[in-house]
């Protein structure tokens, strides 16, 4: 589906989010520069940024590996076109789908649904359905960013998030594929993992669709967009847009599949915060609400689950290992 409304950012009243907040700005900048676009080789959409069960952990992600790479943080958005993240010293140890459950968080769509009166796909209807492709729907946010001086702090944080997200090595089975073979392989993996096409007409089918979206979030934004566009069940399920409860369910389940055992709290939560930003930016592609509404959902989610802790630990720059020299 990969479409949103054509309404401009300023045309839709924002509810729970503040477009001047640091969270909203980070999400908007990250969505524009690091998701759903023709990216440089280091951001190749051909690579899945997840880990398979058969892979062994490849060490830990040291603080040094965060601070050795210098990213462009000053100037206009055009400076992002030639980002070079360099070679990572080590890889984050993350095994998806072998996550240690954390206290207080539900572990499945059914469990999450049981906590509230709404089903897994409550929707908040708009007055109409607009079918515009992603590049066009993003234009309102791009225009706003182009007309403003880029906040160097926001740029540095968003770029560091991209560095963190793209530091994951892809699964060997997918890394060895290329071109059309890769696309076929990804589709095949998803098909057999979920035993055929998803059906949203019953609760089990709805849970399966949520699980498939969670799985797709582990791949590049471009790959996610292609798979959603091909799956009629997914497309029809989100025609009326996501509600915040469904948005939260998907994001919660995605983050639960990240294994951070053995790492310090700062590293573990900092890594999850980066993954949350990446997932939120991708989720704007499967919803038919105006883009700013989804960014608002993301802002609300970050404020609820990450921002208080981030501030208590020195701010976004501190937890992501960004030096003052990089921001100034």
Curated annotation (Swiss-Prot):
GO terms for cellular component: cytosol; intracellular membrane-bounded organelle. Plays a role in apoptosis. Belongs to the Bcl-2 family. The modification Phosphoserine is found at residue 44. PROSITE patterns: BCL2_FAMILY. This is Apoptosis facilitator Bcl-2-like protein 14. GO terms for molecular function: protein kinase binding. Transmembrane segments: none annotated. One of its GO terms (biological process) is regulation of apoptotic process. It is found in: Cytoplasm. A motif (BH3) lies at residues 213-227. A motif (BH2) lies at residues 309-316. The keyword S-adenosyl-L-methionine does not apply. The keyword Endoplasmic reticulum does not apply. Phosphorylated by MELK, leading to inhibit its pro-apoptotic function. Keywords: Apoptosis, Cytoplasm, Phosphoprotein.
